[in-house]
A protein has these predicted regions:
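Transmembrane alpha-helices and immediately adjacent membrane-cytoplasm interface residues
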Residues: 43-89
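Charged, glycine-interspersed solvent-exposed loop segments at helix/strand-loop junctions
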Residues: 236, 255-258
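A structural signal for short, hydrophobic/glycine-enriched beta-strand patches
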Residues: 71, 77-243, 247
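Structural signature of transmembrane alpha-helix termini at the membrane-water interface
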Residues: 16-26, 46, 50, 74-85, ...
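Membrane-embedded alpha-helical segments of integral membrane proteins
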Residues: 1-51
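Lipid-exposed faces of alpha-helical membrane segments in multi-pass integral membrane proteins
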Residues: 9-16, 39, 67-74, 78, ...
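Structural motif marking the loop-to-transmembrane transition
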Residues: 1-5, 57-61, 234-238, 242-245
Length: 258
């Protein structure tokens, strides 16, 4: 009985958390991962009872499930350690350019997670008025306008000069954010081709996302790049961290991080 409760309680927590993420309405289907985790925990909980029937298939399934949990824990542990290396990044002083990575926007303005990025960028820009800010983000299927347009409007309303902000409104993911922003910098400098960027550049995004943003920038040819970490609501951090784990794993397997 105690063993069963130990399994059921975490499964219920995962399912309840998944419902909370669903209710936020982020436009992503990643909340389903929490239901999948809940199902995996329940399966792990009740398989031992089924194994008493001495079915070879049940025993094999039990072993495979344990191996999957070990692999899952190892991947999550390693990636979260990597994410932690940039979790409190403050960026270098006197940056030439700052790239604010796009995130969800709504009809009434940036979503909360996007505001955190913009507010962090604003803090830096107020202290470094010579830094050129690039807001990067295209228009998602659930968004009223390109993210970059609404992000710039927000910064201008907060007092950042419009001429200090460049908009890159075509990107639909982090890799495109980096590549298209790089092309914009090269165009502004009058450089041709796909030259490396020697300027000091900062990547502004939420703390869980900084590591991947910086690594993608280095891979894209930014030689002097640093991260600037913005706040994340702790309640949503488990979902954001787990989703970022998938992003890091995908980009690693695609060769975008090395």
């Amino acid at each position: 009985m105690a063993h069963t409760l130990i399994g059921i309680i975490p499964a219920l927590i995962c399912a309840a958390y998944g419902i909370c993420i669903l209710c936020v309405g982020s436009g992503s289907g990643f909340f389903l991962v929490w239901f999948l985790l809940a199902a995996g925990i329940l399966l792990q909980t009740f398989l031992p009872a089924l194994a008493e029937a001495s079915s070879a298939w049940i025993h094999l399934m039990q072993i495979l499930l344990r191996l999957l949990w070990i692999l899952f824990a190892a991947v999550v542990g390693i990636t979260w350690l990597l994410i932690g290396t940039q979790f409190s990044a403050k960026g270098d002083a006197n940056l030439d350019y700052m790239i604010v990575l796009g995130s969800q926007v709504r009809a009434d303005g940036p979503a909360v997670i996007t505001k955190y990025r913009l507010d962090r960028a604003m803090e830096y820009l107020e202290d470094h008025p010579e830094t050129v800010c690039i807001v990067s983000g295209g228009q998602g299927k659930n968004e009223p306008a390109p993210e970059a347009v609404i992000m710039k409007q927000y910064l201008v309303q907060k007092g950042i000069p419009a001429e200090q902000i460049l908009t890159e409104g075509r990107s639909l993911n982090t890799i495109e954010n980096i590549r298209n922003s790089k092309a914009m910098i090269l165009e502004q400098k009058g450089a041709e081709g796909d030259a490396e960027i020697e300027d000091d550049v900062g990547i502004v995004t939420n703390n869980f996302h900084v590591f991947r943003g910086v690594m993608l920038a280095r891979h894209a040819g930014f030689r002097n790049v640093s991260g600037i970490a913005a706040y994340t609501n702790p309640f949503y951090l488990p979902n954001n961290m787990l989703r970022e784990t998938c992003g890091i794993l995908k980009d690693f397997l695609c060769g975008n991080l090395l």
